[in-house]
Design a protein with these regions (language model features):
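N-terminal phosphate-binding or glycine-rich loops at protein starts, especially the Walker A/P-loop
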Residues: 1-45
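Accessory alpha-helical/coil subdomains and C-terminal extensions
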Residues: 88, 96-101, 111, 139-157, ...
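Flexible, glycine/charged-enriched surface loops at secondary-structure junctions
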Residues: 31-37, 156-163, 214-218, 254, ...
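Phosphate-binding loop/pocket of nucleotide- and phosphate-handling active sites
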Residues: 252, 305-341
Length: 341
């Protein structure tokens, strides 16, 4: 068989582990040929690819990012995108395509599948917001990076008697904020699923200082918002791909808290460091398993599906289910965190 692989959307620790696993299983065990499209769907649309053999994937298991490159270009962005992709698949004699990506990539994968292309998807996102899989690779690494940063920030916050508002990734869901905040013992967490009341947040932080504490750490997912009308808030706008471009919750919240508390407050934006660098052992293993099972699904002809973790098992689920809803932080999970903040 001849299999095409691509990585699309934001980069994520563990992408190279999937690529490596696909090549090892397909080439070494099944005798397949594997090619990798450069820069995601853009590579397929432009027929820009490289051969992937065992030498090409040597030494990439622990490497962050993706050796194939990535972009946010989707076939649906072009008027003839779907037909162009279908033409290149036929021209290259591909038996299957394995796209690795998050919500946007999986929506494109479903579109391609609905138009007759042989697709087996692999989910990735540090946000952990894909509903049909228990965990996505990259999440564990991102939480670890954010937790270490929070641990380090405590000492500088205490030294200067500051409130630090630490912004972590999470456009629509607060999983990174929730887990890193719990792990680091933050004093407040705000997430997109639960618009915060600025009065309640101010009271919570203020009570720490009244009790003689010298600092406070607030963890904010980038998509967190206040309750309507509770404080002035810039919503931001959209980028060229239609994704929300946030105006900076940490900056706005730190200004508000400083004014209300009379304490020095500073924003800290962790940004892309959360999704860069070497993946954790957990993410390497999960990504490797996803790659292995994606190749097996190709050989079984299970197209229009994607890999997912259920418990300790890797299963295949329809792409249609994968893009229906996001996995958001439920109220009970937030309540668990609240009791220890």
């Amino acid at each position: 068989m001849r299999i095409g692989v691509l990585t699309s959307g934001g980069d994520c620790p563990g992408l190279n582990a999937v690529i490596r696993s696909v090549v090892h299983r397909a080439v070494a065990d099944h005798g397949d040929e594997v090619i990798g499209f450069r820069d995601g769907w853009k590579g397929l649309l432009e027929c820009d690819y490289m051969k992937l053999d065992l030498d090409a994937v040597g030494g990439i298991l622990a490497r962050g990012g993706t050796i194939l490159g990535s972009s946010r270009v989707q076939p649906s962005h072009l008027r003839d995108g779907v037909e162009r992709a279908k033409g290149h698949v036929e021209e290259l004699g591909l038996d299957a395509i394995i796209p690795i990506g998050g919500e946007g990539t999986l929506k494109a994968a479903r579109l391609m599948s609905d138009n007759g292309l042989p697709i087996v998807g692999v989910p990735k996102t540090i946000d952990n917001d894909i509903a049909v899989t228990d965990v996505t690779f990259g999440f564990d690494t991102a939480v670890g990076v954010a937790t270490e940063a929070l641990d380090r920030l405590k000492t500088t916050a205490e030294s200067h008697q500051r409130v630090l508002v630490v912004e972590v990734m999470g456009r629509h869901t607060g999983w990174i904020a929730l887990h890193s905040g719990m792990a680091a013992g933050a004093h407040a967490i705000v997430v997109p699923e639960r618009p915060f009341d600025i009065e309640e947040l101010t009271k919570k932080v203020g009570e720490r200082f009244e009790a003689g504490k010298r600092f406070a750490i607030v963890v904010a997912a980038e998509g967190a918002k206040p309750r309507p009308g509770s404080m002035e808030f810039d919503e931001g706008g959209k980028d060229v791909y239609g994704h929300e471009r946030f105006a900076g919750i940490a900056r706005q919240l730190s200004v508000e808290l400083e004014q209300r508390l009379g304490k020095e407050a500073r924003p800290v934006i962790l940004g892309h460091v959360q999704r860069g660098g070497t993946p954790t052992a957990y993410d390497r293993v999960l990504a490797t398993r996803f790659g292995w099972h994606a190749v097996e699904a190709v050989h079984r002809g299970e197209f229009g599906q994607m890999t997912a973790l259920r418990g300790t098992d890797i299963v295949m689920v329809p792409l249609a289910e994968a893009v229906e809803t996001l996995k958001t932080v439920p109220a009970e999970r937030y309540e668990e965190a609240e009791c220890v903040l």
